[in-house]
A protein has these predicted regions:
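N-terminal subdomain of nucleotide-sugar transferases
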Residues: 1-64, 90, 397-399
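Nucleotide-activated donor-binding/catalytic signature segment of Leloir-type glycosyltransferases, i.e.
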Residues: 256-277
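Short alpha-helical donor nucleotide-sugar binding micro-motif in glycosyltransferases
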Residues: 276, 284-290
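Short hydrophobic beta-strand element within catalytic cores of glycosyltransferases
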Residues: 315-319
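Conserved acidic donor-binding segment of nucleotide-sugar-dependent glycosyltransferases
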Residues: 330-341, 350-355
Length: 399
């Protein structure tokens, strides 16, 4: 079976969608599913790497793209270029189309599926309602909610099946009035996420003294990730643990505003911006070095980063919103707290000061993370593809 993935983002752009696509592609291959991926080119000044796919990733077609205003990380595929690339795929060579993002990729991929008479599935990675609130703040929240819900219903009607990465995200779609069948299917963790990171190497490469307890965030440095709240928590944490350092690993549009906030607070020597880290070495080392991993995003459709932290034995303190509620189960190796300054601060301080608690959370977290096998998730996705191919209008629910 051959499945066409179409996405508005992919590596070298680092985010959850890129990670999900790569993880599923790797594991689907062992299920007898060949994937072809159509994504933007990233040939631009200052890009993390060139526009072509890395040598170990065959089956990628890059589309000419242009910059996105006020967003140097992302690229916008050219409509004509995207359709020209899709037109090179011979009719009958694709069994299922899988849309990964809701922008130009969605409309071109849905059109391709209709013209070729093949079923189409989409993964709902992005919680638009909250994103609109952060990126178009002048828009009244009620209007933003109406627009997000109308837009979502319209796009979901274009496909024969939907994938929600978590139960709460499925519930949101049902509340919107989406009638397309919804299947809950998280990405899962590939086996290499459990390769042990080297904490000492991270500290050495980043110039961080061995004696400083690390309060660590990993992810996109964007306003919707609620990192400003974590900075406020850190200010309070230092009153009890003055040697603590906040590590922010990642890039994004909120990096400069956060740097300015840190400067105003006089914390330049206590907050370390690590930037992008190599996924196979630096990122694992970063997790391994964390004395406590903190997270307070309101927009996660899954919260895969929490599982990655647990896989490396990082004790987690986090809020539980949307997709992270599905990850943060009882006994999972995390302290779950409300988004309130004092309770969150108290939980972080408790972990930093209690070595036995750190060890217990680390052990339980590693054990729990292993239950989220990406290979199992890929088999379930392959079953969905097969049911769509056999009977596009009557796919069965995946187990």
């Amino acid at each position: 079976m051959r499945v066409l993935f179409v996405s508005d983002v992919y590596f070298p752009r680092v985010n959850g969608v890129s990670t999900s696509i790569r993880t599923f592609r790797q594991d689907l291959g062992t299920c007898g599913v060949e994937t072809l991926l159509v994504v933007p080119s990233y040939v631009q000044s200052g890009a993390p790497s060139g526009g072509g796919p890395p040598p170990d990733e065959p089956g990628i077609l890059r589309v000419p793209s242009s910059g996105v205003p006020k967003d140097p990380e992302d690229r916008r595929m050219q409509w004509g270029g995207l359709n020209r690339v899709l037109s090179t795929i011979p009719r009958g060579q694709v069994d299922v189309v899988h849309i990964q993002t809701p922008f130009i990729a969605h409309y071109a991929a849905a059109r391709f599926a209709r013209r070729n008479g093949v079923p189409c599935v989409a993964t709902y990675h992005t919680f638009f309602e909250e994103y609109l609130h952060h990126y178009v703040p002048v828009l009244p929240r009620s209007i933003g909610r109406y627009l997000a819900r109308s837009f979502t219903r319209s796009q979901c009607a274009d496909v024969q099946a939907l994938i929600a990465p978590s139960d709460p995200m499925r519930d949101v779609l049902l509340e919107y009035g989406v009638s397309t069948p919804i299947h809950v299917l998280p990405t899962g963790l590939p086996a290499d996420r459990f390769n042990p990171g080297i904490a000492e190497r991270f500290r050495s490469e980043q110039g961080i003294p061995a004696g400083r307890p690390l309060v660590t965030y990993v992810g996109r440095v964007a306003h919707e990730k609620n990192i400003e709240f974590l900075v406020k928590v850190f200010v309070e944490v230092r009153k009890t643990v003055p040697k603590a350092m906040l590590v922010i690993a990642g890039e994004g549009p909120a990096r400069e505003p956060l740097r300015q906030l840190v400067a105003r607070l006089g914390l330049e020597k206590d907050v370390h911006f690590a930037g992008y880290l190599d996924r196979n070495t630096g990122l694992l080392d970063c997790y391994a070095a964390a004395n406590v991993f903190v997270f307070a995003s309101r927009t996660e459709t899954q919260g895969l980063v929490l599982l990655e932290a647990m896989a490396q034995g990082a004790p987690v303190v986090s809020t539980a919103e949307l997709g992270t509620r599905s990850v943060l189960k009882a006994g999972c190796g995390a302290l779950v707290v409300e988004e309130q300054l004092q309770p969150f601060t108290a939980a972080v301080v408790q972990v930093l000061q209690d070595a036995a608690l750190q060890s217990d959370l680390a052990e339980r977290g590693r054990t729990y993370a292993r239950t989220w096998s990406s290979a199992i998730m890929a088999r379930r996705l392959a079953e969905l593809y097969e049911s769509l191919r056999v009977s596009p209008g009557a796919e069965r629910a995946i187990a």
